[in-house]
Amino acid sequence: MVEYWKRNFFMVLVLQAFYLANCLTDEEIPEEWLLLHVLQGQIGAGNYSYLRLNHEGTIILQVQSLKGDADIYVSSLTLNPTFDDYELQSTTCGLDKITIAHHLSRPVGIGIYGHPSHMESEFELKVYYDRTVREDPFADASYDPEVLEAKQRQQQQQTSLDSSQEEESVLRTILIGVLKIVLELLF
C-alpha cells in the first residue's frame, strides 16, 4: 500500500514539473514579428510606470511578470493611462499581451501598473512590430478617376437605355388609352 502511494506521489511531482516547465517556456513568436525593444523594470504596489510609443504600424506589447503582478494599460487619448482611463488593457497574472492596431493615433501612452497584491513587481516588456501586410478594407472604395469615369459612362448608357424603354412604355399606354376611348365612342 505504501508503494502505491509513493508511486502516485512521484507521478504528481513529475506532472507538476512538466506543467511548470511548460509555463516557464517562452511563447513562440511568429516570423513576421520584429523585436524592436526589450525593457526590464520594477514597480511598487499601486504605482504606475509610464512609457510613450511613437512607432507607426501594428505593434504588439508583451509584459511578462517576473515577480509579482504587473498589468498594462494603453491609450491614444492620454499619455498616462490608468485602470480608470484606458483604451486597451491586459491584466492577467503572468504574460500580458496587447496588440496596438496600425490605425490607432500616435503617440500612444503605456502604463504599467504594479498590482497591490505584491509589494513590488518585476516585469519585462517586449515591443514587437508586426510586418504582415494586411489588405486595406477600403481600397476598393478609394478614389480612382479612371474607374470612376468608366462607371459613370456605364451608368449613363444604362439610364439612356432605361429612359428610351420608359418612353416607349408611356407611348404605348397613351395609345392604348386613346384606342379604348375611340372604341367606346363607336360602340
UniProtKB/Swiss-Prot annotation:
Residues carrying sugar: 47
Primary subcellular site in the record, as a coarse category: secreted
Localization annotation: Secreted
Membrane-spanning parts: none
Gene Ontology CC annotations of this record: extracellular region
InterPro entries, A to Z: UPF0669
Keywords of this entry: Glycoprotein, Secreted, Signal
Signal peptide: 1-23
Family: Belongs to the UPF0669 family.
Name of this chain's protein: UPF0669 protein C6orf120 homolog
Source species of the chain: Xenopus tropicalis
